[in-house]
């Protein structure tokens, strides 16, 4: 390989960087980049831009390509000299280009070129180029003590060399002998950065950041043998119908790091006010770390096929973190280091557009094939419902809620809330639901007895996240949600007329006794309960716990206590089923014999029973066991 020291130069001109570049370089070198790998990404990206420019210019002037051959980028190293070389046969730079592009940190050759294209009448020839802030090149000084740039612009005869140690000055010289058109960058590496001279280190950086750029990136070893480093095609740039299922499967396995095929593919190109392409996959398998607190979204961000990051990406909301794939856009705003996204209007627009599209496609899947959608929901439904807890417009929340599926007392299959509403009784007025730890526990809950007996459907929520979203979402399409654990639930209006008259007659006959027994229950239980009421929803169980309207849900309160977010337990309402044989026996015994220790034990045991069923802690488990044993002993005797 021809080294710079073999060239003769003349007319060396020493210049100072504009815009106090010495200070800016200090920021770039020591503060701006957190990952030193970035320097090679930037140099390869710049080289790709140069090739793109030449390809575009050659459409207007074919002679520019005559001596260039295949457009490509080569990387090589010389460990003896401690030097790294990045070469391209792209458009190259003239003396003025070197001053304008490398001597002024606020300037950008690519941006100037893009501006020229935008002003051109021949807009159909527009080429995809990455907009830069003019600092990517200077990241080389993180690892190099000196940077040397040799370049000849396509179509021109003169060759130039630019060099700097990053101390605020640079020099430009004219080369006596002509070099091929394009640009060669030589980095004289700092001794502690010689790891970047290793072929495997270079290959890792290229495959990580530049695997999908338009041009071949080759490594040339010391014997002159070349090896192509970037191998993958950017299939998201193809037309949707041109990508085969096999290509999707291979690409999915590469970005998702899981086996199998994707459950759903979303491949779209948005050409509106904001331009972007997305190729997103929903996996068929739930990742083991889906609910790990440190797990982040793993959608890769590209800018015109150059990988930027997959950390801190705000393009996909956290509740869609199961998505895998890429988002590529020339309009994405980047901060000055290109390592993190700026939180601004463009990012938010892409996020909203993508989120809306994903929810829409999932909705179509749910309608087309419920069995297949159930597989998705089993894997990712709990994550999707996390989005219901986020602040969002009502329309967006209802769209998300519409694709949610739940267990129900009215159907063996998962149902949507729209399905539920379509089956509501005319006088119902509420979407009834019950939360619990498992499907079996909620199905056997006493809270459901009255609803089932009257043919009222109840949605069954069994994921921990259900406790949270039901506390912030109170209605859907004008229908209010109501937990069946609320003490003010009244099911009498759903009773058949004859049965209703019969129940009222029974209540009138027992009214005097029930008032006194409620007072007795309240006296025995004291501060352990907020109040004691006659239940209007129990049919088979003697008692249950309930909470007043507006109070915290039973399960939510328990969760907060378990997480040490709540250090007290609020007294609950005890509902009593006066039609149950046990309660009738207590009423009769109290009426005939008044207060007695056995009756008091029975009241305590009924309360403990209600606590156990709802998963509530008992203040004194030993007392419960003692009272139970006393009562059992009397029964056995």
Swiss-Prot record:
One Pfam family from the record: HATPase_c_3
SUPFAM superfamilies attached to this UniProt entry: ATPase domain of HSP90 chaperone/DNA topoisomerase II/histidine kinase (SSF55874), HSP90 C-terminal domain (SSF110942), Ribosomal protein S5 domain 2-like (SSF54211)
GO-annotated cellular components: cytoplasm
Keyword Chaperone: yes
Chain intervals for the UniProt region annotation (Disordered): 493-512
NCBIfam families attached to this UniProt entry: PRK05218.1 (NF003555)
Name the UniProt record assigns to this protein: Chaperone protein HtpG
Source species taxonomy: Bacteria, Pseudomonadati, Pseudomonadota, Alphaproteobacteria, Rickettsiales
Gene this chain is encoded by: htpG
